[in-house]
């Protein structure tokens, strides 16, 4: 069991802001608390909350249940909550079938709008000298948007020479926490 609370104490008003937002004048940041419970060798329960001590309510919360057989075989189920419309459930998985082949997937479902707003799925092949990855992505900019976007990512890697195609590895690292492209496993 691991519990970690934290908060920043500001001794002066901050002089930096983002865009048109007013400069923050509160003397303290949100109270951040994190907890991790390792259920057994493969299962763990994780929680994170950002608590507003002025308003006495949470700003953002995350709770997840993770199953991890090893670095290349894991499944994560998480629920994210935030002020406003941010209320979603995420399912993500990476599963290595054998030393060369691996599957990956992520789906985000808005529990407030009752619809899937982000899907990523694909397959990856890795050999001694080359690798390739094919991924499909289907998303909405916001869960409430009716407009949908689709993309297909195809990337070839000639080890020691470089990549051809769009850089799907970077997108997948952002989408699936813990994802590392197979071609990067043994880079020097």
What kind of region is each of these model predictions?
Residues 1-188:
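Long, low-hydrophobicity, solvent-exposed regions enriched in small/turn-prone and acidic residues
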């Amino acid at each position: 069991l691991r519990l970690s609370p934290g908060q920043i104490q500001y001794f002066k008003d901050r002089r930096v802001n983002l865009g048109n937002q007013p400069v923050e004048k509160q003397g303290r940041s949100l109270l951040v608390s994190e907890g991790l419970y390792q259920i057994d060798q493969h299962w763990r329960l994780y929680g994170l909350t950002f608590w507003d001590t002025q308003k006495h309510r949470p700003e953002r919360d995350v709770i997840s249940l993770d199953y991890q057989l090893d670095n290349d075989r894991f499944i994560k189920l998480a629920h994210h909550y935030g002020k406003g419309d941010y209320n979603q459930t995420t399912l993500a998985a990476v599963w290595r079938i054998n030393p060369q082949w691996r599957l990956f997937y992520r789906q985000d479902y808005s529990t407030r709008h009752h619809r899937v707003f982000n899907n990523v799925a694909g397959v990856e092949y890795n050999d001694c000298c080359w690798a390739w990855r094919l991924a499909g992505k289907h998303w909405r900019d916001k869960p409430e948007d009716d407009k949908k976007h689709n993309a297909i990512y195809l990337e070839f890697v000639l080890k020691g020479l470089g990549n051809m195609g769009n850089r799907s590895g970077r997108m997948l690292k952002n989408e699936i926490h813990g994802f590392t492209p197979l071609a990067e496993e043994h880079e020097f």
